[in-house]
Structures are given as C-alpha cells and as structure tokens.
Design a protein with these regions (language model features):
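Single transmembrane alpha-helix segments in multi-pass membrane proteins
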Residues: 17-66, 74, 78, 83-100, ...
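Transmembrane alpha-helical segments in multi-pass inner-membrane proteins
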Residues: 211, 222-286
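Hydrophobic core segments of alpha-helical transmembrane domains in multi-pass membrane transport
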Residues: 1, 32, 57-61, 111-115, ...
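Short loop segments and helix-boundary regions at transmembrane helix junctions
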Residues: 41-42, 84-138, 172, 232-233, ...
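Helix-loop-helix "hairpin" substructures at the membrane interface of multi-pass membrane proteins
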Residues: 148-226, 249, 253-254
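Cytosolic-side transmembrane-helix boundaries in multi-pass membrane proteins
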Residues: 184-198, 269-315
Length: 315
C-alpha cells in the first residue's frame, strides 16, 4: 500500500514549491515555443530550435563568465540566435531545401559546435552567479499566488511577457497579417505585393533569436552553468508545444505550464523519496507530450503552407 512520506507532496508548502518551480521551468519552453510559433505561422518549420538553444546557452554562459555581465551574455545569445536564424532562412527559404531535414541538420550543428566550444574554451563545468529572483511589490505579498507567480527572476517575467506580445504581433498588426497570409497562401500574398521571402526571413529570425534567449534563460537563470547537451531536448518539446497550442500563444503558454508542472512534480517526487521508480518519474513529462499531441485538435489551425517552399507562379 502506498504511503506518502512525512514531507508529503500533498502539503501546501510543497505544492506551492512545485508550482513555483513549474513557473520557472516554463521559461525556456516559452521563449522557444512562442518564437517557433511565429516562424511556423509564416510557413517555415524549424526543427533546429534545440541546436539554437544550445549555442545560445553556451554564448550567454561564456560571455557572462568572462565579462561578469549577465546582460552581455543575454545579448550574445540573441546574436547567436540571429545568425542561426539567418542560416536557417538561407537554407530553407532562399535555397528551398526540405525544412524538416534542414532543421535536423541545424540541430546537429548546434549540438556539435556547442560541445566543441565548451571543451575547448571552458573544459570543465563552472558556474556563474545568475539572475536573482525579484519580488514584485504588492503582488509578491499575495498569499500563495505571490510565491508562485511574482517572486522570480527577470528572464521568467520576460518569457511570460512574450505571450501577449506575440498575440498582439500576429493578430493585431499589419505585419502579423502578412505573416499569417504568407503561412496560409503565399501565392495570394505575393500577388498583393507582399515579399514572401522577406516575411519568412524575418519570422524565422525572430523565432531563432527567441530560441537563443531560451538557451540563455537556462544557463543564466535556471541552472547557472553550461554542460554538453544542456537542453536535453527542450527545443523539440517546444516544437511539440506549438502543435499542442494550435499556433496560439496563450494556448502554447498553457501547454508549457502543464508540461512544466508535470516535470516539476516528478523532480519533487524524487527529492521527497516518493516510492516510484525514478525512470518512470522521468518519463512522465514525455509521455504527457505524446498524449497531448495525439489528442489535441490542433491540425485545423495549421498554416496551409507550413513546410512548403514558395515558388512564384505556383498555386
């Protein structure tokens, strides 16, 4: 018969700790998945998100380690994201290579290069003093909710801020209308004078910059270090969250929080020595990902031209 330990996961302080940890852990998923939603809305599938995150995480960590400036590290991650976004755009938009294969190639490149740079330039695992929690006045004093939502570091708040910003961009601006038009019917958009390739370049690059920021949030706000394959597949989960959320930023945020709650829950179960096999606990978030992808009614909102290179004159 199951018996919870004295420090039960069902006690309020522990539950608050789990939910607060989930909010923190959602940060890299939000940066990466919201950015990927923007890229995919223009019709480009970027499976290289995880590789971009790895390079962004390393760049942020190394610059912060050598200069002592966290903000220079953040800028370095954004610059790396910019370069990787332009590379992905060149391959998939200009050269019209198959997007899925191109993205996997980009991931392998990011994985290999980040590992090589870490070995050559750092060598051993080192830590930095990362972003510290900031308690938001008044809101941080609210019982329970204040501890869960309003006592985090700047990258956490910034990640959640991307959700309304992305919604406003995609749904309330002329540029967002162009992005969605290019993603659903690039030929029609082209006939109306929209530069399809430019829109896709910008969208993919924005998404890649956000993936770089997701990597920086890992190395400078969550774990405060870098090691090989630090992301452990976060970028691929982020792509799955885009499908789960139906390309809607708010729904994507809900998926990121759901995944993070399950992930935080399994970590706390191990910390509190709940008698569940550790391998089974580690599997829980990924089993959840498979289930939500299988059950979520997301395909009705999929951009029609997703994963399809644009050729002028084709319909």
């Amino acid at each position: 018969m199951f018996q919870a330990p004295e420090t039960s996961i069902f006690r309020l302080p522990v539950a608050i700790g789990i939910l607060s940890a989930a909010v923190r852990m959602a940060t890299p998923y939000l940066f990466a998945s919201v950015g990927e939603a923007i890229a995919q809305s223009s019709g480009v599938l970027n499976l290289g998100v995880d590789g971009v995150m790895l390079l962004g995480a390393f760049a942020a960590f190394y610059v912060a380690l050598t200069t002592g400036s966290l903000w220079l590290g953040v800028l370095a991650s954004m610059f790396v994201g910019l370069l990787m976004g332009l590379l992905m755009s060149l391959i998939s938009v200009t050269l019209k290579a198959e997007q899925g294969i191109s993205g996997i190639g980009l991931y392998m490149f990011g994985l290999g290069l980040s590992s090589l740079l870490f070995k050559v330039m750092v060598g051993t695992v080192k830590t930095v003093v990362g972003f510290q929690p900031i308690k938001i006045p008044l809101l941080g004093n609210i019982p329970i909710l204040g501890e869960i939502f309003f006592q985090h570091s700047i990258p956490v708040y910034a990640a959640f801020l991307t959700v309304p910003l992305a919604w406003f961009l995609l749904d309330k601006t002329t540029w967002g209308l162009k992005i969605r038009a290019v993603g659903h019917n690039p030929a029609a958009a082209d006939s109306l004078g929209v530069n399809v390739n430019l829109v896709r370049y910008v969208s993919v690059t924005i998404g890649s910059i956000m993936a770089g920021l997701g990597g920086a949030s890992l190395s400078l706000a969550l774990v405060n270090l870098f090691q090989e394959n630090l992301t452990a597949g976060i970028g691929f989960i982020a792509v799955a969250l885009v499908y789960f959320g139906g390309w809607r930023p708010a729904a994507i945020m809900g998926g990121a929080l759901l995944f993070s709650v399950v992930n935080a829950f399994q970590l706390w179960m191990q910390v509190l020595n709940v008698r569940i096999p550790s391998d089974l606990a580690v599997m829980l978030p990924y089993v959840l990902t498979i289930l939500v992808l299988a059950l979520a009614p997301q395909l009705s909102r999929q951009p029609v031209a997703l994963n399809k290179p644009f050729e002028r004159g084709e319909h």
